[in-house]
């Protein structure tokens, strides 16, 4: 009897919901002798860069990246992230007044929040870092502002305030509040 064997790599964000969704793969509960699934959690910009190199078979991506990879990856109908009335937040120190060319920390060049942010603030100077470091960078004065994503939008320092919701930028660009803000999804290699 011929045994078919296939290894499939799946990469996702370290968000609590993603960790939960992919736990069966991470613990080996979804694999058998015909199909071996492996899971890896990484920050979204690392995942985006991995897709540009074709590293994973299935990978979480920012929708801002998709125009760069659509010929190599197909979007899946599952595990997508949209915001409605909420989403990434531009944060600053409580008493900050932003200048036109302020320095901002973003979670990556190819992220959806970076794309949306660059449309709204074309003169801002972007610095890219892991999303877990953004709050600290604003508090320390390393940057003037930062865009928070994931769970960090729910619980950040009292020394900071929300300057602007990226949801509001999206609504202004879309001309309506009826369209959800596209953030990210899962893409599968077409090979």
Regions found by a protein language model. Name each.
Residues 58-89, 95-96, 151-164:
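Acidic, polar ligand-binding/catalytic clefts
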Residues 132-191:
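Pocket-lining segment of extracytoplasmic ligand-binding domains
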Residues 2-28, 86-144, 149-154:
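Bilobed "Venus flytrap"/periplasmic-binding protein-like clamshell domains
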Residues 33, 121, 179-182:
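Short glycine-enriched loop/turn motifs at secondary-structure junctions
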Residues 41-43, 70, 89-93, 134-138, ...:
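Short C-terminal domain-edge/linker segments immediately following a structured domain
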Residues 75-98, 168-190:
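Hydrophobic/proline-rich hinge and linker segments of small-molecule sensing/allosteric domains
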């Amino acid at each position: 009897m011929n045994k078919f064997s296939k290894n499939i790599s799946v990469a996702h964000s370290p968000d609590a919901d993603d960790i939960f969704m992919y736990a069966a793969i991470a613990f080996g509960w979804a694999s058998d002798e015909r199909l071996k699934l492996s899971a890896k959690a990484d920050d979204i910009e690392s995942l985006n860069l991995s897709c540009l190199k074709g590293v994973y078979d299935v990978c979480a991506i920012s929708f801002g990246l998709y125009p760069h990879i659509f010929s190599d990856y197909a979007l899946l109908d599952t595990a997508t992230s949209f915001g409605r009335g909420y989403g990434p937040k531009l944060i600053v120190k409580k008493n900050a007044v932003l200048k036109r060319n302020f320095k901002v920390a973003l979670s990556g060049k190819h992220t959806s929040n970076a794309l949306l942010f660059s449309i709204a603030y074309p003169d801002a100077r972007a610095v890219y870092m892991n999303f877990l470091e953004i709050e600290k960078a604003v508090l320390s004065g390393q940057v003037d502002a930062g865009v928070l994503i994931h769970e960090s939008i729910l619980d950040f320092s009292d020394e900071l305030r929300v300057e602007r919701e990226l949801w509001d930028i999206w609504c202004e660009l879309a001309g309506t509040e009826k369209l959800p803000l596209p953030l990210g999804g899962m893409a599968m290699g077409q090979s």
